[in-house]
Amino acid sequence: MEISEARLTHLKELEAESIHIIREVAAEFDNPVMLYSIGKDSSVMLRLALKAFYPGTPPFPLMHVDTTWKFREMIAFRDRMARESGMELIVHINQEGVEQGIGPFTHGSKVHTDVMKTQSLKQAMDQHRFDAAFGGARRDEEKSRAKERVYSFRDRHHRWDPKGQRPELWQLYNGRVHKGESMRIFPLSNWTELDVWQYIYLEDIPIVPLYYAAERPVVDRDGTLIMVDDERMPLEEGEQPRYEKVRFRTLGCYPLTGAIRSEADTLPEIIQEMLLTRTSERQGRVIDHDSAGSMEEKKRQGYF
């Protein structure tokens, strides 16, 4: 697959901007952390962090907020990448949620996401006293993220106020925070899904195999193809998993992440397929459809 000179220049500019942001945060904040959700954006962000401090190791740890419902392949990939990067990996699980038996099937996506993701992240930020957290969100993903700054200020309760954002002129970022306050930092803000995939291709960045099309056991739930990843998934009466060739455009908790039928099992094929699609990559994320303005409300409460 050939990528034009103009696209290469564009990707190099994005790379330089992201590395600049990562270095700024490392220099400006006392205790930053990189949130590692194991998806393609996290993989790109990790590569940029490794480049930013090469030949040394990035001066901050990786942290994964584990809901206990991630795909098994994601967890295996997470542990492998942590070993290869040489970075410390913090895995945080909301034990209160586990003790209460919170899960996507028993309590629904809204409660599960709030307890096992949002509250869990806030616990981890407080426990480790992080004052900045890198995230892999991009502005092209979803409308609430489109209006979020690169440096996203969070108050003492980790809440985001979209009307109280700080100006960011000429790549100058205001990172001043008081004790207990923090910043969410998004180095990939100006990247698109196409940029991410082309960068993965050019840099030969490892990604979770779930992004590639393969025969997988799925059930159709209200038009969403859900992969049966383990024995915890309750099947409805008469429901039988069937093997179909599918892949995932986005990754999360397996009961809340829809697959797409696809034949794309190589990076060039994924990029070609992406160029022809007219739907958002987050179309398959059940949590984004809980209610109108669902993502913005989650972010106001402390979500990624």
From Swiss-Prot:
Database matches in InterPro entries: PAPS_reduct_dom, Rossmann-like_a/b/a_fold, SO4_adenylTrfase_ssu, Sulfate_adenylyltrnsfr_sub2
Entry keyword set: ATP-binding, Nucleotide-binding, Nucleotidyltransferase, Transferase
CDD domains: Sulfate_adenylyltransferase_2
Superkingdom of the source species: Bacteria
EC number(s) reported in the record: 2.7.7.4
Enzyme class: transferase
Catalysed reaction, written as an equation: sulfate + ATP + H(+) = adenosine 5'-phosphosulfate + diphosphate
GO MF entries: ATP binding; sulfate adenylyltransferase (ATP) activity
GO BP annotations, alphabetical order: hydrogen sulfide biosynthetic process; sulfate assimilation
Pathway: Sulfur metabolism; hydrogen sulfide biosynthesis; sulfite from sulfate: step 1/3
Subunit (UniProt): Heterodimer composed of CysD, the smaller subunit, and CysN.
Family, as annotated: Belongs to the PAPS reductase family. CysD subfamily.
Function statement: With CysN forms the ATP sulfurylase (ATPS) that catalyzes the adenylation of sulfate producing adenosine 5'-phosphosulfate (APS) and diphosphate, the first enzymatic step in sulfur assimilation pathway. APS synthesis involves the formation of a high-energy phosphoric-sulfuric acid anhydride bond driven by GTP hydrolysis by CysN coupled to ATP hydrolysis by CysD.
Protein name per the record: Sulfate adenylyltransferase subunit 2
Source species: Halorhodospira halophila (strain DSM 244 / SL1) (Ectothiorhodospira halophila (strain DSM 244 / SL1))
Lineage of producing organism: Bacteria, Pseudomonadati, Pseudomonadota, Gammaproteobacteria, Chromatiales
